[in-house]
Curated annotation (Swiss-Prot):
It comes from Drosophila mojavensis. GO terms for cellular component: Ndc80 complex; nucleus. This is Kinetochore protein Spc25. Keywords: Cell cycle, Cell division, Centromere, Chromosome, Coiled coil, Kinetochore, Meiosis, Mitosis, Nucleus. GO terms for biological process: cell division; meiotic metaphase chromosome alignment; meiotic spindle organization; mitotic metaphase chromosome alignment. It is found in: Nucleus; Chromosome, Centromere, Kinetochore. Signal peptide: none annotated. The lineage of its organism: Eukaryota, Metazoa, Ecdysozoa, Arthropoda, Hexapoda. Component of the Ndc80 complex, which is composed of Ndc80, Nuf2 and Spc25. Residues 31-101 form a coiled coil. The keyword Cell division applies. Acts as a component of the essential kinetochore-associated Ndc80 complex, which is required for chromosome segregation and spindle checkpoint activity during meiosis and mitosis. Required for kinetochore integrity and the organization of stable microtubule binding sites in the outer plate of the kinetochore. Participates in SAC signaling that responds specifically to disruptions in spindle microtubule dynamics. The NDC80 complex synergistically enhances the affinity of the SKA1 complex for microtubules and may allow the NDC80 complex to track depolymerizing microtubules. The gene is Spc25. Belongs to the SPC25 family.
Amino acid sequence: MRKRLMAMLQNDISLQQQENALAKQSAKFHSKIAAKHQLIKRQQRKLEKLNQVANERKEDQENRSAFEQSMRDKLLREQQNLSEMQTELATKKQRRDELMGFVRTMSEATNTYINLKALPARVKGVALRPEQGEWIPFNCDAYDLKGLNALWSRLNEPSASTDKWQQLFSAEPTAKEKENANASLSSIIEIDLTSPTAHRSLAKMLEK
């Protein structure tokens, strides 16, 4: 009986020791699990911060790319506008150069001198008639067809250049050009070339 009690006591002691060992292992395991959880949480917070930074950088990059594209588009439009302006200016310059050359040629051929500085807005100058001993100053709006026709009728003389003068002064103006037209043909004044002041007046007329 005593041996049996001693054996039972030993078993109880052994079980108690095993339980204590298991309890220690369990506590150690739970401690490690808790430490792992804390580590995971810290890593998650770091990951969230990294993701936030990455998203901000991505957004900045997208904004920068959009801005760069916008600037490229704007630059392209400005280059196109500049190219169109250069083409338009070149066309206008060519047309003006042709007109100036034509006016010079016709002036020499018909003794009619045009103030080139007044073109293209106005037709201003003087027509010489040496055989009559007179000169006729004129100043009219370049788009005033009635005034130009009156001028042409007044200055019209038999000449091989008549058709060219009519072609020069009979082009139909645009609506905008008509709106911008100023006064009609100024009064035509005949002045005797033999007058003492005729040549001085002629020089002043061509300079204006």
